[in-house]
Amino acid sequence: MAGAKVAVLKTRPETVIEDYKKLLHMAEYQKFLPKDTRICLKINVSWQIFYPGCSTTPWQLDGVIKTLLEDGYKKENLYGCHNRTVVVDGKIGEVNNKQKQIVVGKYGLENVHLQPEKLSEFKKLVEQGEWIRYEPRGQLLTLHEVFPEGLYIPKRFIGESILHFPTMKTHVFTTMTGAMKNAFGALLHHERHWAHATIHETLVDLLTIQKEIFKGIFAVMDGTFAGDGAGPRAMIPYEKDYILASGDMVAIDAVAAHMMGFDPMSLTFIRLAHEKGLGCGEFKEIEIVGEDVSQVNWHFKDTDNFASRGQKMIYHGLLKPFEKTLLRTRIVPWAYLASRGYYDGVWYPLVGKKRVRQMMQTKWGRLFQEYA
């Protein structure tokens, strides 16, 4: 797609807030985010436990919100946004990851959780008109089949803008995850795991929908910490010191994928989005301003762990014939408990906790500890 631009900067803790301001201006963000509409700050919480590289960083929010306010965006038009998942508690996660402390504590912004604590109360939101059935104008690849009874999205999003806050990390289902995947946790309700079997097509459908309902779309990606391996949780974190921004969700993911060591067009969701004209997935066709990252290659690998292998058996393997029984009936809580039990009860105490302690000794770990 002609005109795709991604801004990339190297940063350090002493300058990261001002570097985010510089980054946003380099990416010409005001062209993508009108000042006369509300802006959903779509925060990423991939785990309620703090784990480096996993979720939106406090300095990412701090630098962007500060810039928005300094550039004349009205405080009342900005709000932090979270969505409920069946395996991650967003309300605990936004505190442990020091996100709420920035959004509410430092800047006093509205902070919205799109779904109630009790998942059984979701039907009330539909009855009250807070979540509405949406019929996309564009052709969808998979979501009509995933949700045959109707596709529901938050009503409040229609006519607003969205600003995504992903991090640079790998993912067991999509190889890498970034701006396009961040919408997965915004537009779909708590049963969005049903879409994992066709996750690549789902991300393309979600970008199609975003372009229909939002007045503006922009993404700011933090790669100060970056995660390699069986993401988005069970990763090996590294200090990488990069931040990225763009109004093209496909292009920013393509640049991030290239930096991690993946061929962007080999990733199905990037290729499909590029082919549909939703953005630019060809690295050589993207205008990169700031750092020259053409030779950057972190040699990240898309790997699996015990939990993800089990999930893939359900979505793509021997257990595929039983997918609906296992994930769409009354016995489904077994899957949530198994996931939480593995990641929270086994992997983190035995593996993850040590890695967090090591990362807390780094410059970004020390900065994280400085945030109250």
Predicted segments with their positions:
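N-terminal and secondary-structure boundary signal
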Residues: 1-372
